[in-house]
From Swiss-Prot:
Organism: Thermoproteus tenax virus 1 (strain KRA1)
UniProt KW keywords: Capsid protein, Virion
Cellular component, GO, one term: viral capsid
Lineage: Viruses, Adnaviria, Zilligvirae, Taleaviricota, Tokiviricetes
Annotated protein name in UniProt: Coat protein TP1
Subcellular location: Virion
């Protein structure tokens, strides 16, 4: 389990959760997200409703980029080599973002301020 804390809430993430349709608690695949981490993202997601419109791999790296730019924090490193799913959480209309750590290929979910 991964715990993400925001100003108003605390979210618990189940790594074994199946990937379903995009919702307020969106899911991303860390491995796929990592591969496209440095890609230029043509789409800016402003709210969860927009995220629902984007399908397939586009969803993964668009959400990753959004996560990366704002930043959010857990104690657990998300290793892209692991084949588990992590939830990308929406806090209101703002998607929390994923930031690459200084540890090699590792990534860390960090909670926005």
């Amino acid at each position: 389990m991964i715990i993400i804390k925001t100003k108003n809430r605390e979210y618990t993430i189940d790594e074994n959760k199946e990937i379903n349709s995009i919702s307020a608690a969106d899911t991303i695949c860390p491995y796929r997200a990592y591969r496209s981490y440095h890609r230029k993202i043509p789409i800016k997601i402003d709210d969860c409703k927009e995220a629902r419109k984007i399908a397939g791999s586009m969803t993964h790296y668009v959400i990753l980029r959004q996560l990366k730019e704002q930043g959010c924090e857990t104690e657990k490193i998300v290793d892209p080599e692991l084949k588990f799913r992590a939830d990308a959480i929406c806090d209101g209309d703002a998607l929390l973002r994923l930031r690459q750590t200084s540890i090699g290929t590792g990534m860390r979910l960090i909670s926005g301020n």
